[in-house]
Amino acid sequence: MSEHKKTICIDFDGVIHDYSKGWRGIDVYDRPIAGAKEGLLALRNAGWVIIIYTTRNDTPKLREFLESNELVFDYINVNPYQPLGSDKGKILADVYLDDKDITFDGDWEKTVSAIQTFTPWQRKC
């Protein structure tokens, strides 16, 4: 029986790529966010499977950015360990890391309020 590999899906824009000007097509125009390289390496060294989970397509420009900045990853927008019969539209992971997220804690009232007042971290600076 194979051992379960801890899997994390990490958003690209706003988490790995600074993305200071928002979407500008397929170009990756900014630098990596400070600490991204070290954080990804720490996850890799702790045994995590790292999936870059982004609305971007898996393009040569995206891979070139990751590789030229020595940003470790295993896959882009795919989990080869995805259970048979599951929807490939949402990649299975143990953790999702995104700059535009709300963590659901079982309280819908609190969650709706958090959604209505949400501001991405980049706009708080």
Model regions and ranges:
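HAD-like aspartate-dependent phosphatase fold
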Residues: 1-125
